[in-house]
C-alpha cells in the first residue's frame, strides 16, 4: 500500500482537527496516522474514516518513521519537538510563529512563493493566518504593477484565539442578551493583565504590544509579508482588530502601486489565480463576507476600486477562512508541493 506516514501534533485543537479534515478532503495519500497531543489527551481516541486512533503524547520518539509532521500545538511545543521530528527524517510544517523569521526556515504560501519550499532543512513554517490571505491577494497586483506601499486593517474572528474564545463569544452573547455580566478570559489573549468583552464589541489588540505600540500580530504581518514576497523594504503598516465573528478573517487593503492598474485589470489578474475567488458586483450587493467563505479554501476578493488619494492605488476587501486557508489548508498545500515533485 502506497502513501505516507503522517503525524498531527496538537490534534485536539481547532487547527489540529482541521488538519485531519483537510488531509481527507484533498485525498492526501496517508498510509498511517500518528495523532499527538499533550499528556492529558493521551489514550483518548479520534475516529478517522470509521477507525479509532489513540492519541499519543507528543515526544521525540513518536516521530520515528514519520514522513510528514503537521504542528499546531503552540510555539513552545514546536521549539522543542519540531527539530527532533526533522532529525528523524520527517518534513515538518509548523503552524506556530516559532521559526517564521528564522533565515534558515522557508516561510511559504504556495500561491506566492512555492520555490522557497525547496530550500528547507526539514522544517517549513506556515505564516500567520492574516498574512496568508493578504499575500495571496497582493501577489497578482505586485506582478502586474509593482507594490509601492500597503496599508491593511484586519477584522479577525475569535477562532483565531482558539476554541475557548469561540465558546466565550457564544456565552458572552447569551449573557449580555440576558442582562448578565459576561465572563472575560480570552480577549485580547489568555493571561493578559486585563481581559475585554468581545460580544457586541471590537478590540483593537491582538497579542502583546511591542515597540512603537504595534502589537505582535501587526508586526507579524509586516515582517512575514516582506519575507514571503521577497521585498525586505516594502512600506507596510497594519492595524489588527478582533471582532465578534466566530470564523473568518476580513481585511481592508489599501495598495499603492508603481504603475497604473485599473479595477477591471485587477479583477482579471485575480481571476487567473486558482486560489482566489473574485466576488465583486456592487450593483448586486455582492462582496465577500465571512459567512460566505467559511469552509472554503480560497481567498475571496471584492470591493475593488480606485484609491483616489494617490496616483496609482487600489482599495480592496479580502476574506478567508482562517482555520482552513489561514492554517490547515496552507500547511497541507505545502506538503503537496513535495508530493507533486515526486510524482
Where would I find each of the regions flagged by the language model?
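Glycine-rich beta-alpha junction loops
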Residues: 39-41, 129-130, 154-161, 202-210, ...
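Helix-loop-beta segment of a Rossmann-like dinucleotide-binding subdomain
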Residues: 118-125, 201-212, 316-318
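A glycine-rich, Thr/Ser-enriched phosphate-binding loop motif common to dinucleotide/cofactor-binding enzymes
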Residues: 122-133, 213-222, 326-330
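Oxyanion-binding "anion nests"
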Residues: 193-245
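Generic solvent-exposed, charged/amphipathic alpha-helical segments
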Residues: 20, 222-226, 267, 271
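N-terminal Rossmann-like NAD(P) cofactor-binding subdomain of oxidoreductases
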Residues: 1-198, 234-235, 263, 293, ...
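C-terminal active-site/capping subdomain that shapes the small-molecule cofactor and substrate pocket
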Residues: 233-343
Amino acid at each position: 500500500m502506497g502513501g505516507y506516514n503522517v503525524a498531527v501534533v496538537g490534534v485536539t485543537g481547532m487547527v489540529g482537527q482541521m488538519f485531519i479534515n483537510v488531509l481527507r478532503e484533498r485525498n492526501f495519500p496517508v498510509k498511517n496516522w500518528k495523532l499527538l497531543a499533550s499528556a492529558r489527551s493521551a489514550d483518548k481516541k479520534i475516529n478517522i474514516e470509521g477507525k479509532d486512533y489513540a492519541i499519543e503524547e507528543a515526544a521525540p520518539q513518536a516521530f520515528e518513521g514519520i514522513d510528514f509532521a503537521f504542528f499546531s500545538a503552540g510555539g513552545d511545543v514546536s521549539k522543542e519537538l519540531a527539530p527532533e521530528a526533522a532529525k528523524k527524517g520527517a518534513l515538518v510544517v509548523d503552524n506556530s510563529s516559532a521559526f517564521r523569521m528564522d533565515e534558515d526556515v522557508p516561510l511559504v504560501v504556495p500561491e506566492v512563493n512555492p520555490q522557497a519550499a525547496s530550500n528547507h532543512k526539514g522544517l517549513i513554517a506556515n505564516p500567520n493566518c492574516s498574512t496568508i490571505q493578504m499575500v495571496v491577494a497582493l501577489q497578482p497586483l505586485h506582478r502586474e504593477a509593482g507594490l509601492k506601499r500597503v496599508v491593511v486593517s484586519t477584522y479577525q474572528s475569535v477562532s483565531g484565539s482558539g476554541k475557548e474564545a469561540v465558546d466565550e463569544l457564544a456565552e458572552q452573547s447569551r449573557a449580555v442578551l440576558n442582562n448578565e455580566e459576561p465572563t472575560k478570559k480570552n480577549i485580547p489573549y489568555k493571561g493578559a493583565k486585563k481581559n475585554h468583552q468581545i460580544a457586541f464589541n471590537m478590540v483593537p489588540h491582538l497579542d502583546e504590544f511591542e515597540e512603537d505600540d504595534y502589537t505582535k500580530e501587526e508586526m507579524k504581518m509586516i515582517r512575514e509579508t516582506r519575507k514571503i514576497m521577497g521585498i525586505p523594504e516594502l512600506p507596510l503598516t497594519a492595524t489588527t482588530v478582533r471582532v465578534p465573528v466566530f470564523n473568518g478573517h476580513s481585511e481592508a487593503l489599501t495598495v499603492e502601486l508603481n504603475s497604473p492598474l485599473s479595477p477591471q485589470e485587477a479583477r482579471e489578474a485575480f481571476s487567473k489565480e486558482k486560489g482566489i475567488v473574485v466576488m465583486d458586483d456592487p450593483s448586486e450587493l455582492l462582496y465577500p463576507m465571512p459567512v460566505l467563505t467559511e469552509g472554503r479554501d480560497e481567498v475571496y476578493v471584492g470591493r475593488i476600486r480606485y484609491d483616489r488619494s494617490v496616483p496609482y492605488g487600489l482599495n480592496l476587501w479580502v476574506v478567508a477562512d482562517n482555520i482552513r486557508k489561514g492554517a490547515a489548508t496552507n500547511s497541507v498545500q505545502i506538503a503537496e508541493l513535495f508530493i507533486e515533485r515526486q510524482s
